């Protein structure tokens, strides 16, 4: 059972793909990818289901989505176990992902009413009406780091608005999507409303290239997102929503307050999920002087004692592995590159076997031209600064703009920071990876097109229809100049 198309499970006809557990390299899922013809079949199924689905009263669509939420609750532990086996994230963490899926459904229902409501008013003898209509067939591209939660945050708003969906998950996490699709199957969803196509690059290209989709909701790397952006540049008939990564800065003020609380906030920002969250801190700005020295010494001491292990270890880990051996090698190579440019490792990231990498901290202050890259893993770059204005200027020196943070007990510093920083998510004295599901999620620049996830995803799933209405045509008391009747 590999692909879910038009209400049936079908075997793939393309190249073989498999999912390897990153903590022991065992095969946890195997199948054949969808061919271009199978992708077209999935899109056609979604198109055929669209008219009846959008005509279904909202309350009926909501009932099916809420039934899915109940099934997720009932199967939360098994979902969490699959995600842990496939991504390597600690079991305690994947349990929170299953819970977040349920929470996002309630948020999406509220967002539908608040972001895409029906409104009417009277003006100059006319009834002015605002309605919202679904776009049609939506392609959803899911990432590997939150393979349940993040696709769910696009699928649910799309369905509530009356769209149908073709999901193409990351080739790193096909098992998770298959398990979740079976819950949608049990929810009473009509055939063709959601379709699942598994595969790697060729499958994704086939889905993005097809003329049959009306929009694409993407969460993933900036490189892939930019390819899609260029591809869609001449096609105004398709909506493209991009939620990509960031080279996220975290500035520590001299007035940072409690030392251990600050260190804890940094660790949660940089190393949670083994650094595989798009909002993770990548650059840490620390003041010059003894205060900064003491902070870094304590940070290194705490970080080197972070417990890294497989998800189900009896001694509960804080961090698991990278998603793959290739991803682990990428982080180690990034460290070597920064060292060659003049960076000094305060704590060297090391391979721990399979896809495990220990967290690393590197002082990049003396790197003349710091690469503006997202190192998607547990590698934190430290840059020393002298003034807050300098720190903010350096923090803004990136093409990205997803998340940023300031640790400071000084209100005036926060006022300056929030006024001058360029980022979509800006936190004070809280981890960068902390974000509210009912707030905008996204950022400017290379991080995407501003707010395509979380609460505001509703905006991307329906278009506004403005109407001026009257019961019958009327002739005004005074005709327009040059006109006679």
UniProtKB/Swiss-Prot annotation:
Keywords: Arginine metabolism, NAD, Oxidoreductase. It comes from the Bacteria. It catalyses: N-succinyl-L-glutamate 5-semialdehyde + NAD(+) + H2O = N-succinyl-L-glutamate + NADH + 2 H(+). Its EC number is 1.2.1.71. The active site is at 243, 278. InterPro entries: Ald_DH/histidinol_DH, Ald_DH_C, Ald_DH_CS_CYS, Ald_DH_CS_GLU, Ald_DH_N, Aldehyde_DH_dom, SuccinylGlu_semiald_DH_AstD. NAD(+) binds at residues 220-225. Pathway: Amino-acid degradation; L-arginine degradation via AST pathway; L-glutamate and succinate from L-arginine: step 4/5. Pfam families: Aldedh. PANTHER family: ALDEHYDE DEHYDROGENASE-RELATED. Belongs to the aldehyde dehydrogenase family. AstD subfamily. Catalyzes the NAD-dependent reduction of succinylglutamate semialdehyde into succinylglutamate. This is N-succinylglutamate 5-semialdehyde dehydrogenase. It comes from Aliivibrio fischeri (strain ATCC 700601 / ES114). The lineage of its organism: Bacteria, Pseudomonadati, Pseudomonadota, Gammaproteobacteria, Vibrionales. The gene is astD.
């Amino acid at each position: 059972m590999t692909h879910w198309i038009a209400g049936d499970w079908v075997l793939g006809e393309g190249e073989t793909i498999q999912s390897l557990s990153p903590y022991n390299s065992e095969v946890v899922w195997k199948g054949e990818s969808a061919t271009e013809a199978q992708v077209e079949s999935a899109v056609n199924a979604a198109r055929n289901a669209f008219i009846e689905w959008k005509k279904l009263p909202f309350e009926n669509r909501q009932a099916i989505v809420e039934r899915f939420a109940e099934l997720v609750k009932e199967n939360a532990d098994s979902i969490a176990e699959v995600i842990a086996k496939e991504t390597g994230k600690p079991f305690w963490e994947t349990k929170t992902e299953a819970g977040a899926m349920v929470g996002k459904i309630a948020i999406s229902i509220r967002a539908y009413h608040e972001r895409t409501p029906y409104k009417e008013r009277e003006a100059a003898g006319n009834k002015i009406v605002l309605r919202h209509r679904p776009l049609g067939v939506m392609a959803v591209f899911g990432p590997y780091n939150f393979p349940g939660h993040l696709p769910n945050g696009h699928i649910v708003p799309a369905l509530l608005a009356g769209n149908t969906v073709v999901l193409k998950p990351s080739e790193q996490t096909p098992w998770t999507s298959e398990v979740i699709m079976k819950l949608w199957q049990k929810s009473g969803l009509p055939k063709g409303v959601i379709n699942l196509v598994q595969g790697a690059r060729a499958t994704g290209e086939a889905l993005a290239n097809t003329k049959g989709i009306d929009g694409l909701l993407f969460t993933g790397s900036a490189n892939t997102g930019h390819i899609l952006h260029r591809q869609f540049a001449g096609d105004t008939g398709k909506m493209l929503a991009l939620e990509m990564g960031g080279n996220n800065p975290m500035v520590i003020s001299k007035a940072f307050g409690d030392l251990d609380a600050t260190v804890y906030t940094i660790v949660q920002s940089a190393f949670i999920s083994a650094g595989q969250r798009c909002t993770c801190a990548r650059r840490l700005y620390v003041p010059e002087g003894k205060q900064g020295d003491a902070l870094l010494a304590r940070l290194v001491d705490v970080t080197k004692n972070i417990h890294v292990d497989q998800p189900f270890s009896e001694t509960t880990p804080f961090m698991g592995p990278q998603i793959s051996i290739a991803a682990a090698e990428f982080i180690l190579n990034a460290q070597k590159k920064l060292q060659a440019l003049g960076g000094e490792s305060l704590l060297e990231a090391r391979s721990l076997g399979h896809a495990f990498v220990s967290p690393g901290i590197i002082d990049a202050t003396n790197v003349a031209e710091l690469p503006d890259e997202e190192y998607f893993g547990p590698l934190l770059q430290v840059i020393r600064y002298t003034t807050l204005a300098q720190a903010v200027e350096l923090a803004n020196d990136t093409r990205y703009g997803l998340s940023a943070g300031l640790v400071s007990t000084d209100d005036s510093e926060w006022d300056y920071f929030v006024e001058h920083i360029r980022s979509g998510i800006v936190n004070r004295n809280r981890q960068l990876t902390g974000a509210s599901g009912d707030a905008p999620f996204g950022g400017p620049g290379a991080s995407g097109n501003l707010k395509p996830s979380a609460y505001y995803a509703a905006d991307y799933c329906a278009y506004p229809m403005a109407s001026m209405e009257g019961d019958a045509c009327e002739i005004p008391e005074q005709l327009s100049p040059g006109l006679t009747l």
